[in-house]
Structures are given as C-alpha cells and as structure tokens.
Amino acid sequence: MSAYALSQSHRQLTEGHLKDTDPEVDQIIKDEIDRQQHSIVLIASENFTTTAVFDALGTPMCNKYSEGYPGARYYGGNEHIDRMELLCQERALKAFGLTPDKWGVNVQTLSGSPANLQVYQAIMKPHERLMGLDLPHGGHLSHGYQTDSRKISAVSTYFETMPYRVDLETGLIDYDMLEKTAVLYRPKVLVAGTSAYCRLIDYKRMREIADKVGAYLVVDMAHISGLIAAGVIPSPFEYADIVTTTTHKSLRGPRGAMIFFRRGVRSVNPKTGQEILYDLENPINFSVFPGHQGGPHNHTIAALATALKQANTPEFKEYQEQVLKNAKALESEFTKKGYKLVSDGTDSHMVLVSLKDKQIDGARVETVCEKINIALNKNSIPGDKSALVPGGVRIGAPAMTTRGLGEEDFKKIVSYIDFAVNYAKEVQSQLPKDANKLKDFKNAVSGDSEKLKAVRDEIYQWAGSFPLAV
C-alpha cells in the first residue's frame, strides 16, 4: 500500500469539517439559519427546501465535470452522472404530466434568467422581436425590460423588445391591446410569464395571439411551477411551445432551472398536407451547452431529481392547496383592513399590495418590516415611475406555508405588516421637509425604538416556534 504523499495537516484540511477548518464562514451560516428560523419570510420567490434536497445538494456529485449530455460527454467517468441526469429528466416530465414523445427537457441550465436567454438565442437571430409583460406591470427583467432612456435587461440589447401591459383600472392583462400590438409588431416570440402578477394567465388566448402572428409561445412559469405540478392551477403545457422555470420557488427544490421544449408536429401545411416538425431540441440544447455554459452543476441536478420526486406526492399537493388558501387569507385580511390589492386579489401564491392610498411607498415599508424580522420586498405596481421607490409590496405564501402556517397565521401576519405600514407613515411624517428622502428615513429607523423591539421580539419567538428543515 502506498503512503500518503502529502502532510497529515493537508489531510486534515481536506477531511476536516467546516466548523473546524473555517469557523468564520461556519458562524455566518449559523447566523443565516437563525435569521431564517426566527423570521417571517414572505418573499414570493423564496422557499425553504427539504432535508432530502440538502442531502443531495451537499454531495461529491459536485466534484465531477461533465460537459455535454448523457451518452455524449467530453470527459470520461460520467456513467453515474448520466444516470442521474436521465433520472432527473424522467422525473421532470412525470411531475408535469408530460410524455417523452411530445416533450423534452434540459435540466442543465443554471438559473431562470439564463434559461430564458438561452431559449431566445436558440430560436431567434439578433434583433428579432420579442414581446413580454412590462416589468412595472408584473413581468420580469429577463422578458426584455427597458426604459424610455435605457436598455436594462441584456435581452433588450440582443433583441428588439416590446412590452405588453395590464389595464390600469383592473390590473389584468389587456389581451385585446396585446393582440392589436402583436399584429402590428409581429414578434418572433411571445412570452407569457410574470414575477408580480397575481392572476391566472389565459394561455389559450396567448396561443391564439401567437398563432395569429406566427410567433413561438414561450411560457415562463418560474413562480408557479409548484402549483402547476400539483395540479391546483391550470397548466400551460397544452398551449406552449417552450416552458421555462426555476426550481427553487414554489417547486421547492435547489436553485436551478429547466427548459421544456416541444417534440413532434408543430403544424400542417394547409395546401400540401405536409407535417412541419418542431426543431427545438437541438437548438436549445446547443444554446445551453456549448452556447452559454460549460459543465453543469451535477449536485444541483441530483437535488433537483429529489425535489421532482417529492413534487409527485400527495403531500406536495396538500402543501400547494394550503399555499392557495393562505394567499386567499392574505387577500381577505388586507381587504378587510382597507388595503387596495392590484387586480383586487389573487389566484396564485402571492398578493401585490398597493400602498398609494396609504401615502407611503414600498421601500419604506420594506425597511420597517426588516427591522421586525419580516422579509418581504418592495415592488413596482402598474403606473409606477421608480423601481427603487415603488408603490407596492409583494407578499408570498410558499415559504411560511412550508413551515406549517395556516390561514389564521397569515391573518396574524397581515396585522404585523399593517403595524409596519403605520409605523413607516409615522416616521415619515416626522421628518423635516429638507431631509425626507429614503436615506433619511432609513437613518430614522436605524435606532432600536422600544416599539419596534417589542414587535421584533414577539415575531422572533413566534416564527421560531415553527419547524425549519436544515
């Protein structure tokens, strides 16, 4: 038997646990666990993943490089990596009720925004046209956001983008105006997806509009993929050409993404009867690798496979049903307290609260909430001019539902947020006119007032009483 060639201290370095080899990093992680354990987490795009997913995520699967796809790698030693990726793909299709003759899926893409860019690059040439929901109206940066003076998303620099919007009176997508604009603009891609739109999308209508202008219909279901997998809201797969999703929001997996693409017949030539087949699989796979990425994160794919298995259980359906109930509890309680909700409510996992009638903005309310251990986010609402000081807050149910909270608990959460709104208004009203900017407000609440401390201590104890998988 050969002797270990390096020093014993080197061996201890490679085999020692984090708490022994890097206590500084270990302490920061412990502090973050404590924050999660004792906070009310309402970020709509966050969730608490499961112990089994953590188990898969922290494995030597991360050691392996595997550029390419199963059966066609650029490195050796990938037999088990291939098995894992194929299993993950199989479970992804099963989770959404799909069959491999009609759908394929790429599970290598690293996150949601890159997944969308990879899709666009696969099916569009530079400067071809795309339409997506405007960011202040509930869309996402990766759907091509730009302002009057500046291209914000890289998507808007590579492609020509035109937003569609909601009706300012109803807060609902204006499909009639979308259709008129699409007919004039003739986009190559129509994106149906949101980050702060609380109502269901009419995928059938979107399909009809896409067909009318000869566009691909790309659905970004990042926020709602868990709800779709559980069958508690309608699925886009009947109508979409391509579907993208992150894996860590309502799906409750590791941080990652997937791209689903159609296989088979796309259309039939009405004159010749000739079938026109989809040509999406190879362009999308090539766009992911080698187009935009190198080797995939195999530990993430393993953890995603585990999350997808969990998504195909009765317990996951029970969870998603409770998410919807808790979101409805938020809707009813905010309405009861006199708050205006964008679109007057929700059909999904979150509510978007307008604060304009309260004479306060989302940035200030977010600041106070953070002081009392509530994590939510300021959010643009239709008609806003600034994304930094927007007129609303976005509040999601998935994370705290994972920890076991029910409708009465979410009603209690509304009372805490109502306290934060009133406290923010009180502080803002006391600021002098020449020093009432957001930075002045933050300075004013930076101290430890007795009122804030009492509420924070109450929330710390209450939130900490619910289980958290770590």
UniProtKB/Swiss-Prot annotation:
Where is the stretch described as Disordered?
1-23
Task: Fetch the CDD domains from UniProt.
Answer: SHMT
What UniProt keywords are attached to this protein's entry?
Acetylation, Cytoplasm, One-carbon metabolism, Pyridoxal phosphate, Transferase
Its pathway is: One-carbon metabolism; tetrahydrofolate interconversion
- Write down the chemical reaction(s) this protein catalyses: (6R)-5,10-methylene-5,6,7,8-tetrahydrofolate + glycine + H2O = (6S)-5,6,7,8-tetrahydrofolate + L-serine
Positions of post-translational N-acetylserine modification = 2
Kindly name one Pfam family recorded for this protein: SHMT
Bias (Basic and acidic residues): 12-23
Key word Glycoprotein present: no
User: Which GO biological process annotations does it have?
Assistant: glycine biosynthetic process from serine; tetrahydrofolate interconversion; tetrahydrofolate metabolic process
E.C. designation(s): 2.1.2.1
Location in or out of the cell: Cytoplasm
Molecular function GO terms recorded: glycine hydroxymethyltransferase activity; pyridoxal phosphate binding
Q: At the top level of its lineage, which domain of life is listed? A: Eukaryota
The cofactor named in the record is: pyridoxal 5'-phosphate
Q: Where is the composition biased (Polar residues)?
A: 1-11
Q: Which Gene Ontology CC terms are recorded?
A: cytoplasm; mitochondrion
Which residues carry the post-translational modification N6-(pyridoxal phosphate)lysine, per the record? Answer: 249
| Record NCBIfam families | PRK00011.1 (NF000586)
Q: What else is known?
A: In eukaryotes there are two forms of the enzymes: a cytosolic one and a mitochondrial one.
The family classification in the record reads: Belongs to the SHMT family.
What is annotated about its quaternary structure and interactions? Homotetramer.
Q: What is the role of this chain?
A: Interconversion of serine and glycine.
Q: What is this protein called?
A: Serine hydroxymethyltransferase, cytosolic
- Lineage of the species this protein comes from: Eukaryota, Fungi, Dikarya, Ascomycota, Saccharomycotina
